[in-house]
């Protein structure tokens, strides 16, 4: 029962944007630069950071579901450790959205519920499949973050610092999942994940 209460609290905080980072925000070492962006650039960066915030909401749901369905304590511990770092990402993205005078996606409860359901399916397929799903998810997120870094205004070093640290963490999470025994996912599954990602990114940019 205590575990369920704790996990429910994690879900509520992720959806409500009430998470707190354990690590320092990478942007804290930089001076505020938002005022150097024109209104169009600020709207664009807000859209990108909203997408990244949604991605971290989904990451919390995925890791939570896969942790609850893991077959072994080792995999459960690995999912828990990664989820804590992803919680840092969630808090950093929320901080940046506030700095930009923007907001998270209004559809966060929907994104969370959908990602949790997918995580349960991956977890029930077994630890090797679940770890493979983590590895593929992190690979796609790495590419997505690289794309966002390319699309940031040159003056926005604060968002850049956050996304670069997030990308480094995602690469490490993916490598850890593969090294722990994650197996490659079938091509159709990878393609379906990419389609779902495009739907999320297109919608979250605006809503």
UniProtKB/Swiss-Prot annotation:
Co-factor requirement: Fe cation
Gene Ontology annotations of biological process type: ubiquinone biosynthetic process
InterPro entries xref list: COQ7_proteobact, Ferritin-like, Ferritin-like_SF, Ubq_synth_Coq7
Keyword presence, Metal-binding: yes
Amino-acid positions noted as binding Fe cation 1 in the UniProt annotation, renumbered to this chain: 56, 86, 89, 170
Alphabetized UniProt keyword annotations: Cell membrane, Iron, Membrane, Metal-binding, Monooxygenase, Oxidoreductase, Ubiquinone biosynthesis
Disordered: region residues: 22-41
Single Gene Ontology MF annotation: 3-demethoxyubiquinol 3-hydroxylase activity
Stored Gene3D superfamilies: 1.20.1260.10
Known EC number: 1.14.99.60
Catalytic activity: a 5-methoxy-2-methyl-3-(all-trans-polyprenyl)benzene-1,4-diol + AH2 + O2 = a 3-demethylubiquinol + A + H2O
Enzyme class: oxidoreductase
Residues reported to bind Fe cation 2: 86, 138, 170, 173
Localization annotation: Cell membrane
Co-factor binding details: Binds 2 iron ions per subunit.
Ranges annotated as biased composition (Basic and acidic residues): 22-32
Pfam family, one: COQ7
Membrane topology qualifier: Peripheral membrane protein
Pathway listed: Cofactor biosynthesis; ubiquinone biosynthesis
Top-level taxon of the source organism: Bacteria
Similarity comment text for this entry: Belongs to the COQ7 family.
Role according to the record: Catalyzes the hydroxylation of 2-nonaprenyl-3-methyl-6-methoxy-1,4-benzoquinol during ubiquinone biosynthesis.
Protein name as catalogued: 3-demethoxyubiquinol 3-hydroxylase
Species this chain originates from: Cupriavidus metallidurans (strain ATCC 43123 / DSM 2839 / NBRC 102507 / CH34) (Ralstonia metallidurans)
